[in-house]
A protein has these predicted regions:
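Transmembrane and membrane-interface helices of multi-pass
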Residues: 124-137
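Alpha-helical transmembrane segments of multi-pass membrane proteins
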Residues: 104-107, 131, 148-159, 169, ...
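Membrane-lumen/periplasm interface segments of specific transmembrane helices
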Residues: 65-67, 71, 196, 206-224
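Short acidic/glycine- and proline-prone juxtamembrane loop motifs at membrane-interface regions
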Residues: 141-147
Length: 224
């Protein structure tokens, strides 16, 4: 738990974005290099000294990352902000908060994944192929990649969809997109769950509503 990732430097950008957010700065508007060069001058942020460990974070993320705008969706940014709120001055503290979030998501995957497998009459023990996978432990939990958080919302959405609670399932799918954009590719695959007995017309309209709820959720999360 209390260890700095050594196979990825992305976490420096996560912490940077979070500390920008709690300073009232939109992480999508300025690159770290622009702020380092003094592009932004406000009463709230007149120098990099206003952001704790700013020089360490910029150096740690590397010049390639520091020269680009943030591309992390808003729910991801919310996680970064939480890390900044609970560990305003400590890089290791922020890492621990982010890791707790990811571990919590993995436990959620274990819970809803097991329930979903049981509903599908598949061996519930198969969920441990994910939960105990060394790659998952190293890359997600160890190196703080948020695909696990995204997958938690996807699995939860699939579980609710199997229970015919498609509105809440659509909302959760929208939230998953606001963690990582990858679930957008899955949208066409939801048709089989929304078209009972292959009834195209009924399935089409339900799928259309499902997509609209998902899109509305995405827009809502991006609005702030």
């Amino acid at each position: 738990m209390p260890s700095i990732p050594n196979l990825s430097q992305d976490f420096y950008r996560f912490i940077w974005d979070g500390r920008l957010l709690i300073s009232g700065i939109n992480p999508y508007v300025f690159t770290p290099e622009q702020l380092a060069n003094g592009l932004l001058k406000t009463t709230e942020l007149t120098s990099l000294e206003a952001i704790s460990n700013a020089k360490i974070l910029i150096q740690g993320m590397g010049s390639l990352n520091a020269s680009h705008y943030s591309n992390y969706p808003p729910i991801n940014q919310l996680c970064f902000a939480l890390a900044a709120l609970f560990a305003k001055t400590s890089v290791l503290g922020s890492v621990i908060v982010l890791r707790i979030i990811i571990i919590g998501a993995d436990l959620g995957i274990l819970y809803f994944g097991k329930k979903l497998l049981e509903r599908l009459n598949l061996p519930a023990k198969n969920i441990f192929w994910y939960f105990l996978n060394p790659f998952i432990i190293i890359e997600l939990t160890g190196n703080l990649h948020f695909e696990g958080v995204m997958l938690f919302f996807v699995i939860w959405s699939l579980y609710l969809l199997d229970k015919k609670r498609w509105v809440l399932a659509a909302i959760l799918l929208g939230v998953s997109v606001s963690v990582k954009l990858l679930p957008l590719l899955f949208l066409p695959l939801f048709y089989k769950y929304l078209a009972p007995d292959g009834l195209f017309k009924k399935g089409f309209w339900k799928m259309k509503k499902f997509y609209w709820v998902t899109l509305a959720t995405i827009v809502f999360t991006f609005a702030p």
